[in-house]
Amino acid sequence: MKKTLMLLAMVVALVILPFFINHGGEYGGSDGEAERQIQAIAPQYKPWFQPLYEPASGEIESLLFTLQGSLGAAVIFYILGYCKGKQRRDDRA
């Protein structure tokens, strides 16, 4: 119980602390920052290819990014759960 409360407090701190550390800061994605850095280093650079699908808005782009991350996490945790269950089954036999 004590360990659970400590872990929960750490998670809450990790979620809330960034709001106080970077209060009033601007959130920018890594793609935009990478584009700015490339333009600063090599202004003549031309991309090798264009995206197959360009989302209509930033909200849709965020939704797709979140869905991709959620699906990846689901696959990873399914595999971990499967392996853990298989290990328990083998230990009982």
From Swiss-Prot:
It is found in: Cell inner membrane. The keyword Cell wall biogenesis/degradation does not apply. GO terms for biological process: cobalamin biosynthetic process. GO terms for molecular function: cobalt ion transmembrane transporter activity. GO terms for cellular component: plasma membrane. It comes from the Bacteria. The chain crosses the membrane at residues 5-25, 63-83. Pathway: Cofactor biosynthesis; adenosylcobalamin biosynthesis. Keywords: Cell inner membrane, Cell membrane, Cobalamin biosynthesis, Cobalt, Cobalt transport, Ion transport, Membrane, Transmembrane, Transmembrane helix, Transport. Pfam families: CbiN (PF02553). It is a multi-pass membrane protein. Part of the energy-coupling factor (ECF) transporter complex CbiMNOQ involved in cobalt import. Belongs to the CbiN family. Forms an energy-coupling factor (ECF) transporter complex composed of an ATP-binding protein (A component, CbiO), a transmembrane protein (T component, CbiQ) and 2 possible substrate-capture proteins (S components, CbiM and CbiN) of unknown stoichimetry. This is Cobalt transport protein CbiN. It comes from Salmonella newport (strain SL254).
